[in-house]
A protein has these predicted regions:
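Eukaryotic scaffold repeat domains enriched in small/polar residues
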Residues: 19-325
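Hydrophobic alpha-helical segments, especially transmembrane helices
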Residues: 4-5, 219
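Sec-dependent N-terminal signal peptides
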Residues: 5-14
């Protein structure tokens, strides 16, 4: 018994120390491996399944435009990629969406997505069967039945979930597992607890909510009831697009996007924080890695610590492996 505990403690110590020694990442330059005739549209969302598959939400031939189009995308917009090879294992989602945006894979491998043109949130099982729809199609609003360009979803272990809503409404809304409206918080502004495009969000196991407050260039942390805890302000003036917590809850990842005074893209950075929002390292346009960095829209870390990014200028996916020093 003592030997068993010693092994477990040693393993825990090794994992913690290994994680503490991760200072940089290297690009997996042969990932993904897509068919030559396959055209990846704007990849707007990334998730990871329990089996470590990479799930991607992309726009096919659709490009962002205002006013929003009304026709649904003909291509399959949900891709299931092999974690190691980057090959497509499955694809579905044709004739379902107008303007794909956020994606979340919950702990039961259900796939949640938002469509900003439809003003809706969808829940599917892993093979594409529709399980739940929230919001009224093509109708925006600010009540408990409507969204206004919802951007992302985060699902808790008990099945309740949060929606960042979004481009049109500056709020975060919580729903029960069954999709019943529970409460919301936030309004447009720059004070603590206010938002200017809540663009992405994630949860830790304590129920705290981390929000990428895009146009305010910051990440805000709240408790499960929406009570403000802390924030991190991006001093490089980069818009914060997405956040993601690793499965072991050792760190939080974030991504930003910077344009200069002439509205020319400068690129994105990847940030790594502890869960108290203390910045530990960053890479991307700031250097220290060999990947491309144009406009990252989403970020995800898999069960092995590999980082994945979705770039909507390059229409590309990238994988970064951790380097243990």
């Amino acid at each position: 018994m003592i030997k068993k505990y010693f092994v477990l403690i040693s393993l825990f110590f090794f994992i913690c120390c290994a994680d503490d020694n991760i200072k940089s990442y290297e690009l997996a330059d042969q990932w993904p491996s897509l068919p030559n005739d396959f055209v990846l549209g704007n990849p707007t969302g990334i998730g990871v399944s329990s089996s470590n598959d990479i799930v991607v939400f992309h726009r096919g031939s659709r490009v962002w435009q205002t006013p929003m189009p009304t026709e649904k995308i003909k291509e399959k917009t949900i891709l299931i990629l092999d974690n190691k090879t980057g090959e497509i294992k499955n694809a579905w989602g044709s004739d379902l969406f107008i303007m794909p945006h956020g994606l979340e894979v919950d702990n039961e491998d259900n796939i949640w997505v938002t469509d900003v043109a439809l003003h809706q949130v969808f829940k599917f099982n892993y093979t594409g069967d529709l399980l739940m729809v929230l919001g009224i199609p093509n109708q925006s609003g600010v009540d408990s039945f409507h969204f206004n360009l919802p951007t992302d979803v985060a699902v808790s272990p008990n099945g309740s979930f949060y929606v960042s809503d979004g481009y049109g409404n500056s709020r975060v809304v919580k729903f029960s597992r069954q999709g019943e409206y529970l409460f919301e918080w936030g309004k447009f502004g720059t004070d603590k607890g206010e938002f200017n495009i809540p663009h992405g969000l994630d949860l830790d196991k304590s129920g705290n909510v981390y929000v990428a407050d895009r146009e305010n260039n910051r990440i805000q942390k709240f408790d499960s009831l929406g009570g403000f805890i802390s924030l991190w302000q991006n001093k490089s003036k980069g818009q914060l697009y997405s956040v993601n917590i690793d499965k072991s809850e050792n760190y939080l990842l974030g991504i930003d996007y910077v344009i200069n005074e002439n509205f020319i893209p400068v690129g994105s950075d990847i940030f790594r924080f502890d869960l108290n929002l203390n910045l530990k390292t960053r890479f991307g346009r700031s250097g220290f890695y060999n990947g491309k960095s144009k406009r990252y829209h989403d970020i995800q870390v898999d069960n092995n610590g590999n980082i994945y990014t979705a770039d909507i200028i390059d229409n590309s996916l990238q994988k970064f492996r951790p380097i243990i020093n």
